[in-house]
């Protein structure tokens, strides 16, 4: 009986693992089913707000239709200002239709992405939601008029993401205020003057990456540039990369969103980079390490050691090492076990029998040391992610999916049959 119970516990744990849901929503895919919001979706992508929305849990997007967006874009706002305005329409809480009509005490203040950026003074980044007479729900910036109203629910993935339509763009003088002109910022000049000259010069020699950086700056950007010593040691490996891989690597070291240090510390988790494009994920993970902030991939971990600039829409941080994307470098070069000790001079096999007994002392080819060569074989393609991991992404509708898909379902079914037969 004890043996059966032990087996059942193992089966239960496997079932629990296979049926664990993964957070995965894609706001632009969800909006793709609704053509009347195509302009709103387009500017979520252009301002990189879509990336920020997709990586957050429990969020509400207050979308406006194409007519309302046309009225907004006709005012000639820069992309940075549009980003601030639209970020006021992203609530950091879940409000489905039911919750909107059942707000406690009839009114609630919701924090927004605009508030989270730190650019909103006081409570100007909060939105007031109030239940009005006749079933209406009004929206307005904190302290302002309730001039926009709930129209309908567009898409809901309960307690994950809710996309609702409101009647007009939320008016906010603070969000619509002019932002610093990013074109006036000399990216490479800032890097060169603060210990990242080698990286800056490398970026300048790559027209494709330089253009991507400059075009992304207006919408907000964070760069993680390796210090000069780290970059000098990496250059031989970089020079062995193909031209497309060089550009992808440089793009990987920048995130298409502005993050102050405080924001990085409060936004731990995976982030898309400028290199993120479809199947080529090129993600990095931000994680606190005490007062330090670390950046991780499957290949290595680096620490942020200095702030070069932190002025919206641009933040540049120096790192102690070169962060390596798994898409370009092999983990085996970093994670390989230490080489076996070389045999003593006297450890020479005198006979087949003796050799067999001393096989453990046989000299092996040394694996690259993480300290001396942490960059993998740049000429070889990196190993792709596990198939099961690929199955954990959102489907075409942008909804949550079960890990492993059909494969997991088959395994679960087999385990259930096994459990039933075992008990009988």
From Swiss-Prot:
Chain positions listed as propeptide in the UniProt record: 397-424
GO cellular component entries: apoplast; plasma membrane; plastid; secretory vesicle; side of membrane
Lipid attachment, kind GPI-anchor amidated aspartate: 396
Biased composition (Basic residues): 355-366
Segments forming domain FAS1: 25-170, 184-323
SUPFAM superfamilies: FAS1 domain
Glycosylated residues in this chain: 26, 128, 160, 186, 240
Annotated compartments: Secreted, Extracellular space, Apoplast; Cell membrane
UniProt region (Disordered), positions on chain: 338-393
Induction: Down-regulated by abscisic acid (ABA).
Gene Ontology biological-process annotations: root development; shoot system development
Lipid bilayer topology: Lipid-anchor; GPI-anchor
Keyword terms, alphabetized: Apoplast, Cell membrane, Glycoprotein, GPI-anchor, Lipoprotein, Membrane, Proteoglycan, Repeat, Secreted, Signal
Signal peptide extent: 1-24
Domain of life, source organism: Eukaryota
PROSITE patterns reported for this sequence: FAS1
Tissue occurrence: Preferentially expressed in flowers.
Family classification: Belongs to the fasciclin-like AGP family.
Function: May be a cell surface adhesion protein.
Name under which the protein is recorded: Fasciclin-like arabinogalactan protein 1
Source species: Arabidopsis thaliana (Mouse-ear cress)
């Amino acid at each position: 009986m004890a043996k059966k119970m032990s087996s059942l516990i193992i089966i239960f744990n496997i079932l629990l693992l296979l049926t664990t849901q993964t957070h995965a929503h894609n706001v632009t895919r969800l909006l793709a089913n609704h053509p009347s919001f195509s302009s709103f979706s387009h500017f979520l992508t252009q301002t990189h707000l879509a990336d920020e929305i997709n990586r957050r849990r429990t969020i509400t997007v207050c979308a406006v239709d194409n007519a309302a967006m046309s009225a907004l874009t006709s005012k000639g706002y820069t992309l940075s200002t549009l980003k601030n305005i639209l970020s006021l329409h992203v609530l950091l809480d879940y409000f489905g239709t039911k919750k909107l009509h059942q707000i406690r005490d009839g009114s609630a203040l919701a924090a927004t992405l605009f508030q989270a950026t730190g650019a909103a003074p006081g409570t100007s980044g909060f939105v007031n939601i109030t239940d009005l007479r006749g079933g209406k729900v009004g929206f307005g910036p904190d302290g302002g008029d309730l001039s926009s109203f709930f129209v309908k629910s567009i898409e809901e993935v309960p307690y994950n993401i809710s996309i609702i339509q409101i009647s007009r763009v939320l008016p906010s003088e603070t969000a619509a205020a002019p932002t610093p002109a990013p074109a006036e910022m000399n990216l490479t000049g800032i890097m060169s003057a603060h210990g990242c000259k080698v990286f800056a010069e490398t970026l300048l020699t790559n027209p494709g990456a330089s253009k991507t950086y400059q075009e992304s700056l207006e919408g907000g950007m964070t760069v993680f540039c390796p210090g000069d010593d780290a970059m000098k040691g990496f250059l031989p490996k970089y020079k062995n990369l193909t031209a497309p891989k060089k550009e992808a690597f440089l793009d990987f070291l920048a995130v298409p969103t502005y993050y102050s240090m405080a924001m990085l510390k409060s936004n731990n988790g995976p982030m898309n980079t400028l290199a993120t494009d479809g199947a080529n994920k090129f993600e990095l993970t931000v994680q606190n390490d005490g007062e330090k902030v670390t950046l991780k991939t499957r290949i290595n971990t680096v620490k942020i050691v200095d702030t070069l600039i932190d002025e919206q829409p641009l933040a540049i941080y120096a790192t102690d090492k070169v962060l390596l994307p798994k898409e370009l470098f092999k983990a085996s070069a970093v994670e390989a076990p230490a080489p076996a000790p070389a045999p003593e001079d006297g450890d020479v096999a005198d006979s087949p029998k003796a050799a067999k007994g001393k096989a453990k002392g046989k000299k092996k080819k040394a694996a690259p040391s993480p300290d001396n060569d942490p960059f993998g074989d740049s000429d070889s393609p990196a190993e792709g992610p596990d198939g099961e991991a690929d199955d954990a992404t959102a489907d075409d509708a942008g909804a949550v999916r079960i890990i492993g898909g059909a494969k997991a379902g088959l395994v679960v079914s087999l385990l259930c049959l096994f459990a039933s037969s075992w008990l009988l």
